[in-house]
Amino acid sequence: MEKQNHSNESSDGHKSSPLFSSTTFLLALGSLGVVYGDIGTSPLYSIRECFHGTHAIALNEPNIFGVLSLVFWSMTMVICVKYVVFVMRADNHGMGGIFALLALIPGDSGRISPRLHGVVAFAATLGASLLYGDGVITPAISVLSAVEGLEVATEAAKPLVVPLTCVVLLALFLVQRRGTGVIGNVFGPIMIVWFVTIAALGAGKIVDRPDILLAVNPVYAFEFFAANRFVGVVVLGSVVLCITGGEALYADMGHFGRNPIRLSWLGLAFPALLLNYFGQGALLLSDPNFAFNPFYGLVPRTLLYPMVCLSTIATVIASQAMISGVFSLTQQAIQLGFCPRMRIIHTSRETRGQVYIPEVNYLLMIACLGLVLVFKKSSGLAGAYGIAVTADMALTSILFFFVITRTWKWSLARAVPLLVLFLFFDLSYFGANLFKIFDGGWITLTIAAIVATSMITWKDGRAALARKILSSRLPENLFLEDVARHNPPRVPGTAIFMSVSPMGIPVSLLHHYKHNQVLHEQVILLSITSTDTPTVPDRKKLHIVDLGQGFYRIIASYGFMETPNIPTIMRLASMQGIVTDPARTSYYLGRESLLTGGDSKMMQWRKALFVYMSRNAGTPTAYFDIPPDRVVELGLQIAI
């Protein structure tokens, strides 16, 4: 099998497009509806939480200037410098995201010790787990904060906020099965309207108080901490809400490319957000009574209802982007061996990567609705929001450090100062958010702990199971010698034996041969492996070895953004001379019955968890799209 390329050079066509070409412009337009939904709707609650939240600061002119200075420099240093300038350079063949970053640090290359790579893999797993917590909170807080605009219009609408939010969220999750390809085409134009609108609203107030622009001076931020000390640090946990969703610039890079995302961020999203934030600051300088909801305070009263509608649509787009991101993350986790098999439905024939996972969708729906019903106000959820994002950003910085030192070969003299700069901001925000643990932050940490424990247990359990199976395998040369010596009867057709490892003879074949004493004319040993690249071209997917006597070994390589498909594999194999008749082909699968009494080093409760996850995992037949009427399952009892 060909060795996979670990270089940091992208094979993605979008990345190399010129910054100001028509293609880049169109991709930048499309990215507005996917990448910026979360960070683009942060003005709905970010400034409000600083002056009217659980950990609010006194509303006075020095504090307004200090908070706006922190907002400006947070967005500049974390989003513009860290992500746009540096992290987005670490693409894996055009793809971004925390698993793509992990794949750039291959453990089998000699660049990093196995023990250290295990620590790095744990960090990536923890980062991914935190994103699941984010995926639960984002739809709830975004839609709830938008619908709360009705309270500004009339106090009579207050009892309707929670029911309307639940209706919107319920509809959002129920339409996921239909895919987002069609409605996704209008997301970009809607977000253009959103950004232009919030920019205009903010600019209108800045004209009244242009002195608010002086807040770009970092001196105001230092004076803010000097004056407020501990309370100022706590408020930093609310300021960080202005950069939540910033990690999507990197995570969604594979869909649009580096230059289109940079263009859309610097050309529209970033300026529009700054204008709105500074406009809210100008409003509070003029009328402190709007501290309870400064975003809607910018809106003329006659336009409140249309603005609530636009805000709700924008938050639905933000929620959709997060839900799609969780689906994609789950697909990657399954392929990389961190998650049990689940039913993955591809919702678009034209666009790779648009997937729907029913189990994940309904778990998210139940969790989101539960949060809305329990907390009832977006301010209550704000405490749970920032801790996941800041922890994930810190873990991204650490993984990026390993990429630039182990893969790109940067010297420590260059890499360490950059890491220190990134972690200074990341850990400052994370530390400030620790004060929110009892105000809702525990929700995110609990979700992350459950997901991370499950992922690591599944990874370790599958490794222990693979070792157990391999230890009982017969070398292929001994098996083939036995077949040649006994010359068993051969029946017409093809038998395909799925194999965990591309070495030795699968236990399912040994059992079949032992009990039936017969073989098919053509026997294929099929192994599916995951690579450290997002996708594998069809021409490189298969590695075929003729073992003789009608036996063939096929090793199919799939990227971590792809879902293996047996019919596709057999079609590609036929193009290389391995011809099979679907009506005369049988698929033999080993079905393990797992016990916890084995000698593996896993703790007993983790063994029990792994056995439970295995029993509830999706079947290979459904996951690999194997024709169910051609499947033969052979039972095998294994103690781990």
From Swiss-Prot:
- Which key words are in the record? Cell inner membrane, Cell membrane, Ion transport, Membrane, Potassium, Potassium transport, Symport, Transmembrane, Transmembrane helix, Transport
User: Can you name this protein?
Assistant: Probable potassium transport system protein Kup 2
Q: What is its main location?
A: membrane
Using the record for this protein, list the coiled-coil segments as residue ranges, or answer none: none
Q: Where in the cell is it found?
A: Cell inner membrane
Question: Pfam families of this UniProt entry?
Answer: K_trans, K_trans_C
In the record, the note on similarity to other proteins reads:
Belongs to the HAK/KUP transporter (TC 2.A.72) family.
Keyword match tRNA processing? no
Under InterPro entries, the record lists: K+_transporter, K_trans_C, K_trans_N, Kup
- The secretion signal range is none
Transmembrane domains' residue ranges: 19-39, 67-87, 118-138, 155-175, 181-201, 230-250, 265-285, 307-327, 355-375, 384-404, 415-435, 437-457
Query: What cellular-component terms does GO give this entry?
Result: plasma membrane
Q: Which gene encodes it?
A: kup2
GO molecular function annotations of the record: potassium ion transmembrane transporter activity; symporter activity
The record gives the membrane topology as: Multi-pass membrane protein
Q: What is the stated purpose of this protein? A: Transport of potassium into the cell. Likely operates as a K(+):H(+) symporter.
Q: Does the keyword Ribosomal protein apply?
A: no
Superkingdom of origin: Bacteria
| Catalytic reaction list | K(+)(in) + H(+)(in) = K(+)(out) + H(+)(out)
